[in-house]
Amino acid sequence: MNNIKIFEEKQAAYSFSKRSEFYALEPIGIGTNRVEGLVSYLRRLADAHNVTLHALVSYIIKLHPNQSVHPKHTYYPILRNGMSKTMGLVVESLEELRLITNPKNMTMLPWENVMSYSKLFTKEKKWCPICLEEWKNNGIKCYEPLVWGINLLNICSQHNVKLHQFCSNVECRASQSSHHEKLPIEYCQICNQWLGINKNLELKFVNKDIEKWNVWVADNLGEMVIKISNLKIPKNNQVYCIIDKWIQDFFQGDRRRFCYEIQIDNNRLQLIERGKYRLSLNSLLLLSYRTKLKLNDLFYYGIES
């Protein structure tokens, strides 16, 4: 079968059997603004094989074709869909195994040349109770979309409600840690309360006229993950020229005003231009908001104009 890979590994080292069948699950939401994050996919894959996420990720990295890139330590933290070296190794190994197509597009790795990883993801999970309820009612496996983990996102553009971060059980009210491997993800990690629609839940609907910034962020992030496979991400050596073009065309060469609008200081801008730092997602979205250009269009503008 094409979707089955045979694992050969020492049982003492991993939780897998000596010879076990590795079934590739289908990622959820591909091509939509709610594409599944790779960590969510790996959690489901680990659960399907009755192993921990740690064991699965360790095993996948060991299968990387280039032995010289294997980390020397035995613990491989992969808790967010970010731009870490570990995530890069997992993506490359999955591509080699051909379990899923373009696993990189289920992470933020395509943006690593232009976007800072710092504070990109939350430490606590966020979710839309209506999404969970709809998936349950439609027989869809509950999962975590890539955008839910992004720090700046706080609304569900699909249902126009605030994302939730705490259990609705009045005797619990616990946040849900991203470090927790507990499945299924639709139940509280502490009290096992259903996190979808329930009698204790208070939905907070978004007034789009008041929360224009949050709506802009949600729409931009949704479009970003939809088009990520076709986006021309600039290379490192192009970033300086693109930033200079933004300053000249949108701010008439006024570097001070540019820094003010995207909330950085001039020293940080100089370091970014020299390739020492990258712009944060917050700064990129602020620039997008001020210029009224979608985040994706900003980089097309810089490359093609």
Task: Report the location of each language-model feature.
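Residue-level signal for the short linker/turn that defines the boundary of a DNA-recognition helix
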Residues: 252-254, 279-282
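Domain-exit/linker segments immediately C-terminal to small folded modules
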Residues: 157, 161-270
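Recognition helix of helix-turn-helix/homeodomain-like DNA-binding domains
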Residues: 263-279, 301-304
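Residues immediately within or flanking Cys/His clusters that coordinate Zn2+
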Residues: 125-128, 150-153, 164, 185
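Intrinsically disordered, low-complexity basic tails/linkers immediately adjacent to helix-turn-helix/homeobox/MYB/SANT
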Residues: 289-305
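A structured, charge-rich N-terminal accessory region that forms the first stable segment of a protein
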Residues: 2-136, 142, 147, 293, ...
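Short linker/helix segments within small regulatory modules
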Residues: 143-151, 178-185
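Hydrophobic micro-packing sites on short alpha-helices
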Residues: 283-289
